[in-house]
């Protein structure tokens, strides 16, 4: 069963709400305001200040007593970006991925902390699976053939234009998209 069917969606053009799906993946999505009291002022300032472009979201490595995992999303990102980030975290669960560890591994040559046990293959698998669930191929194909722009498609699915363009490209619809959208130029 696919993620969209699991979420109860009947049509390929229905919007998938990752926040509603998160509970089925045993994820507790906490708002930044809910965790803020537990952060030092320096950590808070970094996460929503200088470091805001260095993270999208994350899951706690330890499960909560009720079996759920805690997810925090970057509050400086818009809803469409948070949808993609949360969907990626959901896909990690459904795909059975081992969580990345968040620990200081080493310091870079400029003194910056390199702090994640990052597995590019599983991150790409989770992102691409989540993106496909958010913007499914059959609906994407129809919208591309109808001459919809990536911005219009993004608004329809409540995702970013970058995610839609990624899906169009990996679905090998880019040439058709350019032909339809830019035919008047």
Regions found by a protein language model. Name each.
Residues 1-185:
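Active-site hotspot residues in diverse enzymes, especially metal/ion-binding acidic/histidine motifs
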């Amino acid at each position: 069963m696919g993620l969209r069917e699991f979420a109860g969606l009947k049509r390929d053009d229905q919007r998938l709400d990752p926040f509603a799906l998160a509970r089925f993946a045993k994820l507790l999505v906490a708002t930044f305001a809910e965790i803020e009291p537990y952060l030092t002022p320096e950590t808070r300032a970094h996460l929503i200040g200088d470091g805001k472009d260095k993270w999208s979201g994350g899951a706690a490595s330890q499960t909560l007593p009720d079996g759920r995992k805690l997810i925090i999303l970057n509050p400086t990102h818009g809803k469409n970006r948070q949808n993609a980030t949360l969907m990626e975290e959901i896909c990690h669960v459904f795909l059975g991925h081992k969580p990345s560890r968040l620990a200081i591994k080493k310091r870079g040559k400029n003194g910056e902390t390199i702090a994640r046990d990052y597995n590019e293959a599983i991150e790409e698998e989770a992102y691409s699976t989540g993106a496909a669930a958010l913007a499914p191929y059959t609906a994407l194909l129809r919208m591309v053939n109808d001459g919809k722009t990536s911005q219009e498609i993004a608004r329809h699915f409540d995702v970013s234009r970058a995610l839609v363009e990624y899906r169009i490209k990996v679905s090998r619809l880019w040439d058709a998209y350019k032909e339809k959208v830019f035919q008047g130029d």
